[in-house]
């Protein structure tokens, strides 16, 4: 399962998986980009499904997980790639942090942080039942070195990096090396 598969990074990773013979579920909120990506991926094999999905909607993620298990019997890998910045969330060179539109901050931090946490929550349950699986969360260099003028994005990617460390140790305590 690859979230953000309609984008450049998600699409490139999906392509690599397809080239290795993996079954891929490409998830993206943008229908048109997802459709184009799935058509491109089908040149590498037929085991690809495109699902329009919202990584911030737990109920739809649960349905997605159930549908995948019903079709293929298991979920081996979750790649949390969905995320990004948005217009209005980037400060202009002459703009101060206190001038930022708080609604942009909330949208960017919600997408980048919870867009990783929610799929991890849902798919880790499936992997726990299986006794194994792999969750890969994509953060950014912004997590380790603040990028000028993108405070929400930088803060959220720092949260993703820390959440990833926490989740790995939490799952290791319960499942060993299985997840």
Predicted regions located by residue number:
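Catalytic Tyr-X3-Lys loop
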Residues: 76, 84, 98-118, 132, ...
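Canonical Rossmann dinucleotide-binding motif of NAD(H)/NADP(H)-dependent dehydrogenases/reductases
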Residues: 1-25
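Conserved glycine-rich Rossmann-like NAD(P)H-binding loop of the short-chain dehydrogenase/reductase
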Residues: 20-36
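The beta1-alpha1 cofactor-binding region of Rossmann-like NAD(H)/NADP(H)-dependent oxidoreductases
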Residues: 31-32, 52-64, 102
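Alpha-helical segment proximal to the catalytic Tyr-Lys
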Residues: 125, 169-173
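Residue(s) in the substrate-gating loop at a strand-loop-helix junction
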Residues: 140
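Conserved mid-core segment of classical short-chain dehydrogenase/reductases
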Residues: 62, 85-106, 129, 149-152
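Active-site helix of classical SDR
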Residues: 120, 156
